[in-house]
Amino acid sequence: MSAWLLPAGGFPGAGFCIPAWQSRSSLSRVLRWPGPGLPGLLLLLLLPSPSAFSAVFKVGVLGPWACDPIFARARPDLAARLATDRLNRDLALDGGPWFEVTLLPEPCLTPGSLGAVSSALTRVSGLVGPVNPAACRPAELLAQEAGVALVPWGCPGTRAAGTTAPAVTPAADALYVLLKAFRWARVALITAPQDLWVEAGRALSTALRARGLPVALVTSMVPSDLSGAREALRRIRDGPRVRVVIMVMHSVLLGGEEQRYLLEAAEELGLTDGSLVFLPFDTLHYALSPGPEALAAFVNSSKLRRAHDAVLTLTRRCPPGGSVQDSLRRAQEHQELPLDLDLKQVSPLFGTIYDAVFLLAGGVTRARAAVGGGWVSGASVARQMREAQVFGFCGILGRTEEPSFVLLDTDAAGERLFTTHLLDPVLGSLRSAGTPVHFPRGAPAPGPDPSCWFDPDVICNGGVEPGLVFVGFLLVIVVGLTGAFLAHYLRHRLLHMQMVSGPNKIILTLEDVTFLHPQGGSSRKVAQGSRSSLATRSTSDIRSVPSQPQESTNIGLYEGDWVWLKKFPGEHHMAIRPATKMAFSKLRELRHENVALYLGLFLAGTADSPATPGEGILAVVSEHCARGSLHDLLAQRDIKLDWMFKSSLLLDLIKGMRYLHHRGVAHGRLKSRNCVVDGRFVLKVTDHGHGRLLEAQRVLPEPPSAEDQLWTAPELLRDPALERRGTLAGDVFSLGIIMQEVVCRSTPYAMLELTPEEVIQRVRSPPPLCRPLVSMDQAPMECIQLMAQCWAEHPELRPSMDLTFDLFKGINKGRKTNIIDSMLRMLEQYSSNLEDLIRERTEELEQEKQKTDRLLTQMLPPSVAEALKMGTSVEPEYFEEVTLYFSDIVGFTTISAMSEPIEVVDLLNDLYTLFDAIIGSHDVYKVETIGDAYMVASGLPQRNGQRHAAEIANMSLDILSAVGSFRMRHMPEVPVRIRIGLHSGPCVAGVVGLTMPRYCLFGDTVNTASRMESTGLPYRIHVNMSTVRILRALDQGFQMECRGRTELKGKGVEDTYWLVGRVGFNKPIPKPPDLQPGASNHGISLQEIPPERRKKLEKARPGQFTGK
């Protein structure tokens, strides 16, 4: 009789599945028949297997057994078989189904894992798995649809629902209880790069965030080696601060290489000093036993042992004496496991798989019992599993009062694991086991985070306690009110201190200001003098005087900047009154581009009497503008002012006055002399508020002259008191007069041909109205109309400064009146000439450069010259074989004695010019000339193989032929004879010296060539054997005669030759003179010297008529 296979949806009815006489109870009675007799044994052998009489419940165990060797070490086949064998032998399950197990492989890649789940659910009645968290939620839905009980032991955040019943408490719940107990809210996750661990990290971070914890970072180790670990830890170190790092990967205690690399990298980066706690994730799925056996991976690595001191291990709890290894040992002793199985190589995950299968079976049994043995659904099985209490591999599964997790830590030596705390995720409690946690280096636990992160009823804003926020808010209010009071007090106090001391003080003395005055000349007084430009004085006319100020100057230096001093009337000022200080402080705060900056009040003694109490000079110190006043600028006729230039100046003036009027300051003394221009041609208003300062200081102003009142409004002329204070409308009138000055470039009212006194009288007492006359061609019509509005008789008819600003801007149709643009337009007419001039100068420079290059290449080889021009060093160069030429004029000493110095220079210049023309047609390099000696080389600086000997030989023949017809200009009857010496060999060439560098040759070849010349004869080419060999090898028809044995100084006796010609050489060669026996080859005979020259020679060298 065959067994019935239960469908995936549950069990059929008892009557259909298990007949009464075939139940497990009857089978048990049959198996318990007494007597060991042979009939009984035969009957036992003939009985069918129990599964033949029971319904079969197939359990699928899904996991990455084929693609992950560490998961494979859990031996899921043996674990599931051991569980089903014990279930099938359990008499307490009498009448229940027969359990069979199927091991199902789960791919390590997420897409394959989903496919494996879908396939498994069609083949089994209950499924243990999957392990990949990405497949957990789809597995729950598919299992619910298929009615299959699901035990997903690898999903960190899965809750019991529907047909799903986790074998143990979800990892996220256990972790949350631990983090809450220590108040570690800020965590980071590092995952292995495999899909399974990446998805586990995502699922765990989602579960922790759902519980309100701020997961700062989830990162992977890519690559999965030491470098990837360092990079992942650097991201955590450089990111938001965290307390805990959860390592989502195989534990190093089970051989996980990624976690080994991670801990070693943390030790290298100094992150295992107690500032971070490292929590392994995979130990939450199995029971890791305390003791020294668990740390076998650290035996040969002290570095890893030190790093693991920062690790806290949260794992499932086994009762004392009931660890996974103890249970494996007992099962092997009872022959339930193969005897050859190495238990040390079995992963603790063995017990987790065993428990999942066992728990599933307990749920099936309770579900069938609840319905009387009939059909049950997957949801019923899952519900019974959640309420079941069965004996697992190392303890009781299901509802129990004992804590299900323990917290393990290493001792100080890192030699064993010990239990520090017991954790109950159901009650959310963590109680001490008697041994405290040992943090690295004896440090305390990482600082706790705010408790609001763990309170679901409180919104935690960045980890700040609400109470602290409220207290902080009150503190801010109190501090704000106190600060406002202190600020008000300190402002007045600092203002007073700034007036008398500090870098921003406004009371200046002789120690602060250095004055300048002309030497021996006169200048205008401080108060009445016009503002002259400092640029008009030469540096030889000014000097620094670190003493009392002279009355003849109003320019000084303050903190390195030029300043201008405006003197108060009088010279006996006792002190600066407080009202003056306050008034000046307000004026000093005025900051605008078109308003001169006030720097301080100067108080010192006079020039004649030292500074004494009650006597001194008081002046306003303001910034100095280099181009002087507007009055001075208009008077300089060499400065051309077009309309754009004028409108730019006027617009600056209007903007400055507009700023002052917005601040409630009436100038009262506005005139072109109180408008200054800086180096950028920006106009600035100065002397503003001067009347206020005089009034505050209680100083009576000096009566103004008629010339100073030309800018004053008529209503102010009629009221002196009002004139001293000034009005806004009066400033508008003064502005109109300044506009007339700028437009006409003349003094006020200049076109009326009246004296200042007459003008003031007519303006003060109309009618008729006395106003300037401006021609229509001097300015736009709008500008003339604006001037007329500004100098209206009635103040209320004059426009405000704001309206004046708008009207003046409309004159230029909105175009910007920038002086720089105006100056650029003025310079455009010179641009073409400037370009032509630059081009001409560039061509001249290029020509001079070419001349310099030609001169340099005449003095040095081109390659050497280029190197020197580029600034690079010229290294000495060795040449294996070159040919050198030396020549000398026979009797040059005698010729020099018979000639004037200028005649000797002409002789050498003519001769060497001839030589230079000849060497230009040969591949040779002229090395140098020393007196009458001429040195040429071939084969350097450019190598030419062995042609150097032929080039020098041909050149020597050409030179000898040319010398035969050469005559001196001052002694044409005296022949010029030369001796020539040739030699070939190696040498070194290089540039010698820094001043007038020369390209020089060094080596024995140079000496030998010189000896060949000195031992030669007139009109002869003396050739060494080394050159002869090369010429013969070239076979170009050179004709040579053997001279015989010749003694060379320093070289001994050698065979030498005369070069007498070459086949095809048709130029005449002079005949060598016949030498008398004993005669020298270095002189000129007496008969060849003209009589008149001979007398000169006899006087110069008495008794000698030949010589060199």
Curated annotation (Swiss-Prot):
Cytoplasmic membrane side: 491-1108
Membrane topology category: Single-pass type I membrane protein
Record entry for activity regulation: Activated by GUCA1A when free calcium ions concentration is low, and inhibited by GUCA1A when free calcium ions concentration is high. Negatively regulated by RD3; inhibits the basal and GUCA1A-stimulated guanylate cyclase activity.
Localisation: Membrane; Photoreceptor outer segment membrane; Endoplasmic reticulum membrane
Ranges annotated as biased composition (Polar residues): 529-552
Post-translational modification: There are 9 conserved cysteine residues in sensory guanylate cyclases, 6 in the extracellular domain, which may be involved in intra- or interchain disulfide bonds.
Region feature Disordered, mapped onto this chain: 520-552, 1069-1108
Subunit structure: Homodimer; requires homodimerization for guanylyl cyclase activity. Interacts (via C-terminus) with RD3 (via C-terminus); promotes the exit of GUCY2E from the endoplasmic reticulum and its trafficking to the photoreceptor outer segments. Interaction with RD3 negatively regulates GUCY2E guanylate cyclase activity.
Protein name as catalogued: Retinal guanylyl cyclase 1
Organism the protein comes from: Rattus norvegicus
Gene name of the record: Gucy2e
